[in-house]
């Protein structure tokens, strides 16, 4: 399955919520009619079946993190193999992706931009250049911007934007050195309450 390259706001309208696919400079409701689904006439959403609700939740989370269908399925299988709550395990696996950590540290204004930075070898983990967006970051890993990439305008702009957002408790960033530490894997209480991971577990349990 190819990665979606179309309008980002169309995906947010499809899911009926902000997927944080844009930089966040403007509120999403000033950019599009979030309460209507995409299409020529922007029909309002009908009542979904239980399966439909579960599917939409899975698609929402998958799109927030920019993960393809096969990748997402593999993450779920790994989460189910681990001890503890499968839904929480799933979110923690997604949160430890390198592209997501780069976004959380404020080096990129969106996860898609973070994925580009990683792919273009602008990110260093523990002193080694890593260009795999799905690379798993572990507690106490150092994630920094490569020296020759530190003057990129988009990174500087992203850091300025990150100053306006609430900073995640599980990362620590030196914005002058462009060097951060992934202090710990976030707990469920740290993450968005707008995600209902139990619906995803129910979907895959069918």
UniProtKB/Swiss-Prot annotation:
Is the keyword Transmembrane in the record? Answer: no
What PROSITE patterns would the database entry show? RIBOSOMAL_S4, S4
State whether keyword Ribosomal protein applies. Answer: yes
Which residues are in the S4 RNA-binding domain?
96-156
Q: Name one GO molecular function term.
A: rRNA binding
| UniProt KW keywords | Ribonucleoprotein, Ribosomal protein, RNA-binding, rRNA-binding
What processes in GO biological process is this protein linked to? Answer: ribosomal small subunit biogenesis; translation
The signal peptide annotation in the UniProt record is none
* Annotated coiled-coil segments of the chain: none
- InterPro entries for this protein: Ribosomal_uS4, Ribosomal_uS4_bac-type, Ribosomal_uS4_CS, Ribosomal_uS4_N, S4_RNA-bd, S4_RNA-bd_sf
Sorted alphabetically, the Gene Ontology cellular component annotations on this record are:
small ribosomal subunit
Q: Where are the transmembrane segments?
A: none
Q: Would you say which domain of life the source belongs to?
A: Bacteria
Q: Which SMART domains match?
A: Ribosomal_S4, S4
Its biological purpose is as follows: One of the primary rRNA binding proteins, it binds directly to 16S rRNA where it nucleates assembly of the body of the 30S subunit.
Family classification: Belongs to the universal ribosomal protein uS4 family.
Query: What NCBIfam families would the database entry show?
Result: PRK05327.1 (NF003717), rpsD_bact (TIGR01017)
How does this chain assemble? Part of the 30S ribosomal subunit. Contacts protein S5. The interaction surface between S4 and S5 is involved in control of translational fidelity.
Protein name as it appears in the record: Small ribosomal subunit protein uS4
User: What organism is recorded for this protein?
Assistant: Colwellia psychrerythraea (strain 34H / ATCC BAA-681)
Q: Which gene encodes it?
A: rpsD
């Amino acid at each position: 399955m190819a990665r979606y390259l179309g309008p980002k706001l169309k995906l947010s309208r499809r899911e009926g919520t902000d997927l944080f696919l844009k930089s966040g400079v403007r509120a999403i409701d000033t950019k599009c009619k979030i309460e209507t689904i995409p299409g020529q006439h922007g029909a309002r959403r009908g009542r979904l079946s239980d399966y439909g609700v579960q599917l939409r939740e899975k698609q929402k989370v998958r799109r927030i993190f920019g993960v393809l269908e096969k990748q997402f399925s593999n993450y779920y299988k790994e989460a189910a193999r681990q001890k503890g709550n499968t839904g929480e395990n799933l979110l923690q696996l997604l949160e430890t992706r390198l592209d997501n950590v780069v976004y959380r540290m404020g080096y990129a204004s969106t996860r898609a931009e973070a994925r580009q930075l990683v792919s273009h070898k602008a990110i260093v983990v523990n002193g080694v250049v890593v260009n795999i967006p799905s690379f798993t970051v572990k507690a106490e890993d150092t994630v920094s911007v490569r020296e020759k990439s530190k003057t990129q305008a988009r990174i500087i702009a992203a850091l300025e934007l990150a100053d306006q957002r609430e900073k995640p408790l599980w990362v620590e960033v030196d914005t002058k050195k462009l060097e951060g530490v992934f202090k710990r894997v976030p707990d469920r209480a740290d993450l968005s309450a707008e995600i209902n991971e139990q619906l995803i577990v129910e979907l895959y349990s069918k």
